[in-house]
Amino acid sequence: MSVLDNAKDHFKQKLSGELKKITIREWKTDVYYKGAYPFAVESKILELQQQGKVVEALVESIIQKSLTPDGKKMFQSGDKWTLMNEVDPAVITRIAGAINSATLDVQPGDVEKN
């Protein structure tokens, strides 16, 4: 196998891994999410962050990454306005923090000073 094939297999395994969840007491539900996402999903979130639209980036990450227990999207793009204007920002921040932290695979010991 080539290095690229190995890299693709590694990422497929991460994408197909078990869903993680965060319990949202205020909403009386659990939000499920994956431990990794392709750049196709991350690109819009990164673009919003680079434009200084941090709140929109948080909401976009929730829209793109929040899943039901069976792995289906919990929210649609049309829910963005409601999430930004009619939902508790503290809850949005907590969910986005959990979902976005899950994709960070760097452990403190992995980074060494030169």
Regions found by a protein language model. Give the residues of each.
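Short, surface-exposed, charged amphipathic helix/loop patches that serve as local interaction elements
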Residues: 27-114
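Extended acidic low-complexity intrinsically disordered regions
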Residues: 1-18
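Short acidic-hydrophobic surface loop/beta-edge motif
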Residues: 18-28
